[in-house]
Regions:
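Short Fe-S-cluster ligation motifs
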Residues: 171, 175-191, 205-222
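A charged, amphipathic alpha-helical module
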Residues: 114-146, 156-161
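Short secondary-structure boundary/hinge segments and terminal tails
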Residues: 81, 161, 190, 199-200
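Fold-independent oxyanion-binding glycine-rich loops
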Residues: 17, 156, 170
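Charged, low-complexity surface patches
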Residues: 52, 142, 171
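Iron-sulfur cluster-binding cysteine motifs and their immediate structural context
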Residues: 138-139, 144, 148-167, 177-194
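FMN-binding flavodoxin-like domain, especially the glycine-rich phosphate-binding loop
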Residues: 1-132, 195-197, 204, 208-230
Length: 230
């Protein structure tokens, strides 16, 4: 997503992304608007926690606006990432992998209840300040300046200032990667949390792999925690 050359060509090209407020994150939307996909089979896999609110239909509409013919959109239900557990339907993933391999044309169905949920969400958001989500994070005195938060942030919205993490509003996607990866749980929310101690790291992806995949300009190399390996 950080490449200057955004022309991609392959037999199959897919986007796997979470949904925030029933839609793909802003940076994913911007990527789709700028990129060119030269493929006969473009697909999207969207992950969600509480409810999807018609995410497949919204993603299909986004692709149409971007001039991207999308052949397949499916949803993967995960437990909300506020909780320190991981729940993914392995059987559903197997079906998705088979569908994509066979180039199945299918868009996940959307109900009127899904659409109503999204409209209710939008109505609630209109009551909040436009930049409310940009001020969701704070850094406590527990910060040890390891730099992990800076390296896992996909939008360069957190940085080290005098060996202490500092959140930078403006481009924050509120993915909470910084909060979940902090070894001291020093990245907290500015609003009450159901469980302030609940943090989750995918056991199938090492922190080093996450950092290397992210590769933010200006970030240092993979950090070392007290335990040594990240």
């Amino acid at each position: 997503m950080h490449r200057e050359d955004l022309i991609f060509s392959d037999d199959r090209i897919g986007i796997v992304a979470p949904i925030y407020g029933h839609e793909v994150p802003a940076m994913v939307r911007e990527f789709l608007e700028k990129a060119t996909f030269q493929t006969p089979y473009f697909y999207m896999i969207l992950t969600y926690g509480n409810r999807h609110g018609g995410a497949a239909e919204l993603a299909q509409e986004l692709c149409a606006r971007c001039g991207i013919p999308v052949r397949y959109i499916n949803l993967v239900h995960m437990v909300d990432n506020w909780l320190p557990v991981f729940d993914m339907e392995e059987e559903q993933l197997a079906v998705i992998q088979t569908d994509v391999a066979q180039k199945v044309a299918w868009i996940a169905p959307v109900t009127e209840a899904d659409r109503a949920a999204h409209q209710a969400f939008l109505a609630g958001m209109r009551l909040a300040p436009p930049d409310a989500w940009q001020h969701l994070l704070r850094v406590t005195q527990d910060c040890i300046g390891c730099g992990i938060c800076q390296q896992v942030c996909p939008s360069a919205s957190i940085r080290l200032v005098e060996d202490r993490a500092e959140h930078v509003p403006g481009r924050c996607q509120t993915c909470l990667a910084c909060a979940h990866a902090c070894p001291r749980k020093a990245v907290q929310l500015t609003v009450p949390e159901k469980n302030p101690s609940a943090r989750y790291r995918n056991p199938h992806v090492t922190l080093r792999e996450l950092i290397q995949a992210n590769q933010q300009p200006g970030c240092a190399g993979p950090a070392e925690t007290e335990g040594g390996r990240v």
